[in-house]
Amino acid sequence: MKVREAGSSKFDLMSLGECMIRLSPPGHGRIEFSPTLEVWVGGGEYNVAYALARLGMRTGFLSRLVDNPVAHIILNHARSAGVDVGHVVMAKYDGVGRADRIGLNFTEVGTGVRASVTMYDRGHSAASNIKPGMIDFRKAFSEQGCRWLHTGGIFSALSDGCAATVKDALTAAKEAGTIVSYDLNFRSKLWNSQKAQQVTKELVPHIDCLIGNEEDFQKVLGFEVEGVDEHLSALDTRAYKKMVEKVVKAYPNVKVVGTTLREVKSGLVNNWSAILWHEGTFYESRRYDGLEIEDRVGGGDGFSSGFAYGFLTGKSPQECVDLGAAHGALLQTTRGDTSQIDLEELTHVFKGGSARIKR
């Protein structure tokens, strides 16, 4: 897969999606019993632009927010890492949020036998009200230049306007020679499988890199994976590989398929690894067995960030999947959806470094 050389464009990567405010009880508390809530910033697509900015890449965010102090939390968060927000459309705030608002999610971090839980409060958000033409994609991709566009199924699921906007973005990106990655990211609270397949099958012909776990490919593209239990807690990689071969046969434009492999032992202990298909060959990452987790939300976005960083910096496919797995593992050691990892830490773990204290 050929990626534009560094320095050929204003942006190494841009993400298109919604960014929300996440409210979480401290520790492993319950929402209904917590007198205080921590404020975090995150969104499935935004998280990738933020992570790569922390790794030294030139990134930008494409979205729509409403112009009020809550949105400024998001803008300040992006700017703090160097994420360009010049293509974020700001809607006028009506003082109440009847027309546009900032999406919220309430997330409990599970432990033991109790799973993590996310409750959405994102209806009628500014991002979900986006329409084609609100963002000038040709300016971003053709005039300013962008090497890589990342978006995904969470944003496409929010509304018909979001799905149409994603299609416009993918069309403009391909016309400009921009690599497109798309995280299938199925969320049953946002849409059903039938609608997901209807929308996504129109998008895949414009996509270079597909990211998704076994459930994503089943629910979003209709491909079955043999050997998965009803709780989706274990996966036979041989069955996954067979499914990927069907995917790339159906969509020959797809050059990369990647996923994380998570086996849940408890709310805070998982076995973690990743697998990548690149132009006919499969690559498997180092395994992180018994990975101790602080907060699993955003782990998949961490993988997407790491492998995109690898391709953008000219690494081999094996190095790309190892970078993705390492970054995803590291991201889950901290609270919040977005990366708190720098390039030195990523390189240390990617090269097999241990958690021995550094003095």
Predicted regions and their residues:
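Conserved N-terminal subdomain of the carbohydrate kinase-like
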Residues: 58, 62-153, 346-359
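Conserved phosphate/ATP/ADP-binding segment of small-molecule kinases
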Residues: 176, 190-281
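Short catalytic helix/loop segments, enriched in acidic residues and glycine
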Residues: 28-50
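Charged helix-capping and loop-helix junction motifs
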Residues: 135, 163-168, 194-201
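Alpha-helix C-terminal capping segments
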Residues: 40, 47-59, 80, 310-313
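Conserved post-catalytic alpha-helical subdomain immediately downstream of the catalytic base
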Residues: 267, 283-353
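Positively charged, low-complexity intrinsically disordered leader regions
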Residues: 1-31
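Short beta-strand/loop segments at the ligand-binding rim of alpha/beta enzyme cores
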Residues: 177-184
